[in-house]
UniProtKB/Swiss-Prot annotation:
Active site: 258
Protein name per Swiss-Prot or TrEMBL: Putative methylthioribose-1-phosphate isomerase
UniProt cross-references to InterPro entries, sorted A to Z: IF-2B-related, IF-M1Pi, IF_2B-like_C, Initiation_fac_2B_a/b/d, M1Pi_N, NagB/RpiA_transferase-like
GO terms for biological process, alphabetical: L-methionine salvage from methylthioadenosine
Positions marked as site (Transition state stabilizer): 178
Binding residues annotated for substrate, in chain numbering: 66-68, 109, 217, 268-269
Top EC category: isomerase
The enzyme's E.C. designation: 5.3.1.23
Pfam families reported in the protein's UniProt record: IF-2B (PF01008)
Family: Belongs to the eIF-2B alpha/beta/delta subunits family. MtnA subfamily.
Record key words, sorted: Amino-acid biosynthesis, Isomerase, Methionine biosynthesis
Catalytic reactions on record: 5-(methylsulfanyl)-alpha-D-ribose 1-phosphate = 5-(methylsulfanyl)-D-ribulose 1-phosphate
GO molecular function (one): S-methyl-5-thioribose-1-phosphate isomerase activity
Amino acid sequence: MRDIDPSLRREIESLERFLKVKPLYFDFDEGVFVWLDTRLIPFREVYRRTSDYRRVARAIVDMEIRGAPAIGVAAAYALALAAAEAASRGGEGFIEALSEARREIESTRPTAYNLFWATARVYGAVSEAFRRSGVDAAVRAGLEEATRIYVEDVRGNVEIGRVGARLLESGDTVLTHCNTGALATAGFGTALGVIRYAWMEGKDIRVITTETRPVLQGARLNVWELRKEGIPFKLVVDSAVGLIMSRGMVSKAIVGADRIVSTGHTANKIGTYMVAMAASRHGVPFYVAAPASTFQPDAGPEAIVIEERSPDEVRGVISEAGYVRITLGDVEAYNPSFDVTPPELITAFITDRGVIEPPFDVNIRRTLED
């Protein structure tokens, strides 16, 4: 799995100047997928490596890899690895094995639309190459399509940052919820990427990040990324958002998204709806930053599936010592991983295609079709 279009390698090299952190990538020399295990951040930086698509799927389930764009890239490479494994069967049973792997990968995280978008692209590329030229061409096509998705994500994230930075001014204090930086993408970030780009432009920006219970993506991952960038920040508990907005401590709020449908309804990390309501109540602009691959323009809010995760995530926290229980082990806990923010609470979407303003039911489709 080393033979790909040289232009793709050159494009990866040209984009690496934007990547202070490489959270995931494909090692073409060894033929393995590599990722930074985000469960261990900020205490340790450990990279995992595999050529087994099942291991990548498990990494998505266990949130070693998380964030919709990152999940999409990982799923793309997982299916490319599955194609390489299926090739050992020869022509007979190749598509059947690929389809089985696709179903397994798509079952990992039901809310993130990027996952389904990415696997559909890789599956289509592999199937077409197999039909035209056979197994070897199909394996190469899968790896190249996954790499295109990787390149598009980095390039798109940088463009989101450039577009969104225009909305920020020196002196702004920006609130963000959950991790939407390099660790949630192929390497630059969406909402946190907007903040990063504005900082790179020399704007005096300050950040307030929520801790983001129950998995603490803000307290663990945002803190790690913001400190690496040298961007000033404060960490607050999720339930402090209303108070700090009521005191005028927030200029703008920017979050990411896991799925955005045609109406503008937005699925994102649990607690986002609460942030949006507080922002609306206190007149704080509320932006959602996401690439085009997160939008599902042919679907309505009924298409959004809310993932429910293990109650143990609520019963305990991840610490430097590992998982630490904070309540009784038999307490009944409910753990929806996402909520849905209605479009009337959203000021605009910041995308790699530009800023999308209301009416969203018209402008989302128009922007994505241009």
